[in-house]
Swiss-Prot record:
Cellular-component GO terms for this entry: cytosol
Keyword Mitochondrion included in the entry's annotation: no
InterPro entries: Class_I_gatase-like, GATASE, GMP_synth_C, GMP_synth_GATase, GMP_synthase, GMPS_ATP_PPase_dom, NAD/GMP_synthase, Rossmann-like_a/b/a_fold
Pfam (any one): GMP_synt_C
Active site: C85, H179, E181
Protein known as: GMP synthase [glutamine-hydrolyzing]
Underlying gene: guaA
Domain of life according to the entry: Bacteria
Domain GMPS ATP-PPase residue range list: 206-398
Glutamine amidotransferase type-1 domain boundaries: 8-205
Amino acid sequence: MTNIHNHKILILDFGSQYTQLIARRVREIGVYCELWAWDVTEEQIREFNPTGIILSGGPESTTEENSPRAPEYVFNAGVPVLGICYGMQTMAMQLGGLTETSDHREFGYASVDLQATDALFAKLNDNLTASEPKLDVWMSHGDKVTRLPQGFQVTGITPTCPIAAMSDESRRFYGVQFHPEVTHTKSGLELLTNFVVGICGCECKWTAENIIERRVARIKEQVGDDEVILGLSGGVDSSVTALLLHRAIGKNLHCVFVDNGLLRLNEGDQVMEMFGDKFGLNIIRVNAEDRFLDALKGIDEPEAKRKTIGKVFVDVFDDESKKLTSVKWLAQGTIYPDVIESAASKTGKAHVIKSHHNVGGLPDYMKLGLVEPLRELFKDEVRKIGLALGLPAEMLNRHPFPGPGLGVRVLGEIKKEYCDLLRKADAIFIEELYKADWYYKVSQAFTVFLPVKSVGVMGDGRKYDWVVSLRAVETIDFMTAHWAHLPYDLLGKISNRIINEVNGISRVVYDVSGKPPATIEWE
């Protein structure tokens, strides 16, 4: 079996908003990596045994006395090190160089003139017409290195940053003031490939096929002949988890699909058809709509709704699990960003804006072992594995759907009438986006039910019915987003269809709020 963890990169996080992008790029190259906080111990690094180390950017200033520093062992481990932005600055400071606050801060696009073609910049040039090689990069820094550590040379400059890149080839230490991990840096992926493959010597074994092989073997090794229970929602994470488990243990997997009445139009039937009929999984469908809606009566505060939905789900799942007395393991679709966010919250550095629908987990008394086959994977990797396992691309690439479902897309108190109207309106919106070839041009699109009525006219009659809002956004990382500029004729067609085909809706509006200041979901 291929050892997919044999070569691996350790990324030390100094707090940059782009740090997870570094990890995703390294994985995209085909090499395993992990993301750890900057203050790890020498013992932890030795135990991980990285093939190379990357120091991320960060919001702090190396000119401040108590700013974060890389563990000294990083520079004594005998492996290549790449410092990015703040990572380059702390490398310079810790190895005897000097940094200062810059008079000319650089934020945005910049052109770096390469001064030497070391191994990091091998074969890189974004401007073939210039006499010297240049790179088109993305800068985001206020400090700069002003004196090199001993043994280093300048490998890149900009008009306002005389040391935009540096290297000590003998020790295989490299620093870049720009961000190769973002797509704005034209040859960023090639630069990271030069480091990970060319300099560190990593083999590209982190592929979907190898991951599936290893995950299936690990599941068999972990659970043996025991039975496993999984809450299957039909979302990407739980779906891929189900297929990995099914491949490993077959009928010993029991999937529980809780139909909470807060799903999209016909979604429950689609889940049963896909996983029961097509893939042959053991699925128990629990029709719990009344139970959820009863629990949500009178609750209009968004966070209280989320908590209630989460609690009822646990109660329903608990009731079903008690019927499966031979089950010894609980499977969850935890992915790597969940692990990172959980670790961050334990340090006290994370601020809860909206609670995650899985927070709290199952009751302690259930005493089940935990199986998390996706724990090492980013979402894009989960999709690639799902595709390799036979899931249709249109399902894997659907827009995100919140864990509480329509519970956070019906504003205020949730009622069955509201959910039914919203389901129909949303289905029309999505159908028309597909028809107009706009669905994959936007990052997320959905309809929101507003608990207000508006006067309308249908034929010769007056109507006084509900209002819905259409929402479509464009984003790269969902941390910030722009509202999508859908064509007016498309919006008009969607509005006309909803008002004419959904009895009970008299007005359709379009949300033109960006994030920030608004969030993508309304609740």
